[in-house]
């Protein structure tokens, strides 16, 4: 037989941000500006199986320093130094209590189950935790720009340099909780696996 079930799981989204700016006139021909922005947020979004959710944490910050120097009435020099950092963590969250015996990996949350199809993305139905649990990334950008603007009548010439260093660290191995695939509902009820994937040892990049 079949049974219809209706769920209204709670979606939790939270975000905070702030920004600060300061300007200072060093002298008539020089102006200094500094700015900083920070943003933090997290969300818990239930999956198709309402007993499990995806947990996402985001963070970003940007700091910049600018110095504008008036060389002459027709020449302007602008120097900028900046730093930005972005980070995210993507994980699995359980919205109910499960015994340890239901986990594919010892000490971890329950993994994913797919019925029909060769993978979770093509399955008829899915259950269990997020297959991308434990994914994270950190990226730093260091930027330096130095530019000159020359104005002559209705004409303007701009030239300068732009340098940037990128630092990127990540760990994006999926299926750490394990994913079990069954061909049909009958094979699922019989406990006959078609495929099982798990990443026991993952490594960071960067």
Question: What residue ranges belong to the model's regions?
Answer:
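Short acidic-glycine motifs
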Residues: 1-206
């Amino acid at each position: 037989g079949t049974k219809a079930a209706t769920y209204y799981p709670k979606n939790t989204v939270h975000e905070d941000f702030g920004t600060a700016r300061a300007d200072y006139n060093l002298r008539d021909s020089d102006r200094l500006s500094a700015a900083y922005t920070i943003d933090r947020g997290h969300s818990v979004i239930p999956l198709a199986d309402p007993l499990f959710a995806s947990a996402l944490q985001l963070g970003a910050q940007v700091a910049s320093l600018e110095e504008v120097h008036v060389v002459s009435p027709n020449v302007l020099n602008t120097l900028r130094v900046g730093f930005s950092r972005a980070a995210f963590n993507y994980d699995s969250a359980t919205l109910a209590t499960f015994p340890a015996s239901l986990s594919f990996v010892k000490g971890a949350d329950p993994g994913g189950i797919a019925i029909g199809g060769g993978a979770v993305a093509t399955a008829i139905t899915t259950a269990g935790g997020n297959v991308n649990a434990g994914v994270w990334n950190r990226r730093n950008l260091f930027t330096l720009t130095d530019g000159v603007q020359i104005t002559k009548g209705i004409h303007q010439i701009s030239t300068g340099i732009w340098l940037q260093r990128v630092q990127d660290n990540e760990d994006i191995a999926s299926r750490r909780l394990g994913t079990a695939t069954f061909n049909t509902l009958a094979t699922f009820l019989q406990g006959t696996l078609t495929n099982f994937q798990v990443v026991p040892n993952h490594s960071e990049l960067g």
